[in-house]
């Protein structure tokens, strides 16, 4: 029954031929392009540079187990500069730590359960930002990162893509920090 419904929709083929080790990269690119153009929108290219300014720092946070930095990340977009705050919590481990990028529904450590201390206790760093500091979850594309690019094409990027883009900019910054093991970021 489902196969009949799919045939009736006359969908384009996802890939001509069989997927194997030799053509996997091409197949993956086709799938990513389909999702971009038909579902989530096309994400603009990464900026040339991500700038970071430490706005606040506490070297003895979370019961003395970690350093906390509030960092303002900024980068240039089509319609100007965009910046948003990221809170970095880095364990006092004496070595490079794995890190979790955590787009939060609430501002840093203000409401609800955020397992920051538990994560630090396991030797992981944490990079937390509130999704609303990037762009609000509504149909308005005039605030935050949403205002930084022109709109009008059918495959313009959406809010999920913008939050993912922000996660990537956080990663760009994390990769510059010796305290973070850049090969172990989730």
Positions of PLM-derived features:
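N-terminal targeting or regulatory segments adjacent to alpha/beta-hydrolase or S9 domains
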Residues: 1-83
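Cap/lid segment of the alpha/beta-hydrolase catalytic domain
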Residues: 95, 99-186
């Amino acid at each position: 029954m489902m196969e009949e419904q799919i045939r009736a929709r006359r969908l384009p083929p996802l890939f001509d031929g069989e997927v194997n080790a030799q053509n996997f990269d091409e197949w993956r690119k086709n799938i990513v392009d389909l999702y971009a153009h038909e579902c989530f929108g096309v994400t603009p290219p990464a900026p040339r540079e991500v700038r970071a300014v430490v706005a606040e720092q506490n070297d003895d946070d979370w019961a003395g187990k970690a350093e906390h930095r509030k960092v303002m990340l900024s980068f240039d977009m089509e319609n100007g500069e965009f910046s948003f705050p990221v809170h970095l919590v880095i364990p006092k481990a004496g070595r490079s730590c794995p890190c979790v990028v955590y787009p939060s529904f609430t501002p840093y450590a203000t409401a609800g359960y955020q397992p920051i201390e538990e994560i630090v206790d396991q030797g992981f760093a944490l990079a937390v930002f509130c999704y609303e500091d990037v762009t609000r979850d509504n149909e308005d594309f005039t605030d935050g990162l949403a205002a930084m690019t022109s709109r009008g094409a059918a495959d313009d990027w959406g809010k999920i893509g913008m939050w993912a883009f922000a996660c990537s900019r956080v990663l760009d910054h994390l990769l510059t920090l010796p305290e973070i093991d850049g090969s172990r970021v989730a």
